[in-house]
Amino acid sequence: MSQHELDIASSPGDVRPWIRYISSVKNDKTTARQKCILFERAVTALPRSYKLWKEYLDFRSGLCTGLNPIKHADEYDRVNALYEKSLVLLHKMPVIWLQYLQFLMLQPKVTKTRSVINEALRSLPVQQHPRVLKLALQFGTKVGGPTSVQIWKRYVLAYPDQKETMAQSLIKMGYHGEAAVVLIELLNASGDNYALWTELVDLIGESDKLTLEPPVEQIISSGIKRFPDQRGPLTVQLANFLVRNGDLESARDVFEDGITTANTVRDFTVVFDAYAEFEERIVTHLIENESPMADLRIAKLDHLLERRPFLISDVRLRREPYSVLEWQKRIALYEDPAETVAAYTEAVQSIPPAKADGKLSQLWISWAKFYAEDRETACEIYHKATLVPYKSVSELADVYLAWSQYESENDHWENAVKIIKQALESPNTHVSYHNSDLTAQDRIHKSVRLWSYYADLVESYGTFEETKQVYEKIMALDLLTPLFVVNYATLLEENDHFEEMFKVYEKGISLFEESAFEIWNLYLVKASPRLGLERLRDLFEDAISKFPTQKALYILYGKLEEDRGLVRNAMRVYSAMCDHVKTSETFKYYIGRTVENFGLAATRPVYDKALESLPNKDASELALDYAQMEEKLGEIDRARAIYGYGSQFSDPQIIKYYDAWHKFEVAHGTEDTFKDMLRIKRSIQAQFNTDIHYATTAAEVKKGTVQEFVKGETVQKGNIEPPVAQANEDEIELDI
């Protein structure tokens, strides 16, 4: 007897001798049959030993590895029997149940496997069910059919978060009804999950017959309420479901409801296009079958297409019920006069003036214009329009202006004037135009636009005195504007009331600081031919003191002095202009007037002043003109000195200046003066190139980020000495 047998005999209730015995024969030459006998002895001796049964079952299952479960069904059945035998006493051991299920899944025994799954779930505690169910789910996925459905139902009880996966699996297996039920449960639990709704609706759309609780119609209707932004696609899905189920009239009702209740053009377009396609298919079917109903359906389809622009208008008006623009678009759709009038009536009744989006007055005006050929009705509408409590005075003014213009165009100018006059009459003249607590009707008499039109109207059809009274009323109401000043002054001028005209200009100047210069300009132009010199001088001095940088005032003042023969006074004015407005244009104008009155030579002091005052770029330009002027006068040395002096303002990149100097030296210079020119040019070039500040500033000027380079920031006046000319007793030294 072997030692293992002795150990077992000495310790019959101990599992360890059996384990050692079994381990010793695992890798020796003992046959499988002999090993099985040993395992049988062991589990018979200790039937409750999990270790022994686990070793035995692993060994017997391993013997089936690679064997075809159909050809060797007997061998598989014997192993199955062993599992059953072990579970009699070890039914609380989840590992054995799981191992048994995995072994069964290798065999074509669907019913047996389902039975074992149920037994495992009954035998094991609830905490162990998920392990069994995961394995069962693999089995269900493998076999499919009702078995898979039932397993999924059991599985999601343990894993409720896997319901969406269950729905996907059921859809793949073709169980649309069961999948829809799962999706409905998910939607009821999760609320507004649009992805699930889309999945459910698509599922319904793919199923010709689907009985659900709640019904499909109710489900999709619920989706429309939950997801109003998807109203269009969901409505089409519902209608298509009804069509597939043969309920065409109900589908048509759904389409009609969809196009008449859509809140966006996008939803409307989706539903309308599907509706039209649905009707076209019906018409095609009826025509192919020569049905007598074909003509009726064609007529209904045509009517549907004709309704489209009106239905779109309905959609827009549902979104913007107080939009004047949308109501105008709606009215434009009608061709029948009666329908147009009805639309206008509906529009003005539907828009509360305080909530109007846009100018409600334009709606009333266009309605009145609709009756342009019926003066009595048009005037009645205009009158009603003037009673509407508009949000702004401007809208009420639009109505009065349109009404008056209508009467004027129809040669009823007296009525045109009367309409505006009545609008502008008010017992309370002290109200504020901007007081929104008052109605537009209470403030209309302060409308500048209406007064302006009234003044033009009275001027066209009334007398001078009547027009004058209008302007005086405007002034009394403190409604004067710069335009009123100019118009009133022009009216007085045309009727030879010059002193009153001057007073109007002066009042405008005192009231409008921002526009005072323009008014001064007109005032001085009008006053120059009519007032004495001393008074005019006072006016000009006053204007210039207020606007010292306005070149036009100096030019006008200087011209006055010249016209009166006081040329030297004019020159003083031009000199003052150059003191206050330091630009090349002002100096050129001053130089031009000096040349005309005193000749070229007299311009030297002006040029000197310009070179002292102007920034580099302008100084360079004037220096060139100055030198060329001296050249014309034959003053060659003076011209050369000016070229040299002006070079400090002139970047050598300014080709014009140095080209002129070059030509001058070629024409009048010597070799020495030419060399001096080149030396100065090189010196200036070096100065401009090495001045870092200049280089940086020039780059920024090129980009437009800073002002241009000005004299005094780089090369200072006098830094470069003019070239020394040849000894000449007539040489003139410039003190510039």
Curated annotation (Swiss-Prot):
Keywords of the record: mRNA processing, mRNA splicing, Nucleus, Repeat, Spliceosome
Superkingdom, taxonomy of origin: Eukaryota
Cellular compartments annotated = Nucleus
SMART domains xref list = HAT
**What GO cellular-component annotations does this UniProt entry give?**
post-mRNA release spliceosomal complex; Prp19 complex; U2-type catalytic step 2 spliceosome
> Where's it mainly located?
nucleus
Swiss-Prot/TrEMBL HAT repeat ranges = 1-27, 30-62, 74-106, 130-161, 246-281, 339-373, 377-409, 428-460, 462-494, 496-529, 531-563, 598-632, 634-667
Q: Which Pfam families match?
A: HAT_Syf1_CNRKL1_C, HAT_Syf1_CNRKL1_N, HAT_Syf1_M
Provide the GO biological process annotations.
generation of catalytic spliceosome for first transesterification step; mRNA splicing, via spliceosome
Q: How does it assemble?
A: Associated with the spliceosome.
Chain's role:
Involved in pre-mRNA splicing and cell cycle progression.
Q: Give the record's family classification.
A: Belongs to the crooked-neck family.
> Which PANTHER family did the record assign?
PRE-MRNA SPLICING FACTOR (PTHR11246), PRE-MRNA-SPLICING FACTOR SYF1 (PTHR11246:SF5)
Its recorded name reads Pre-mRNA-splicing factor SYF1
- The species is Yarrowia lipolytica (strain CLIB 122 / E 150)
The opening ranks of the lineage are:
Eukaryota, Fungi, Dikarya, Ascomycota, Saccharomycotina
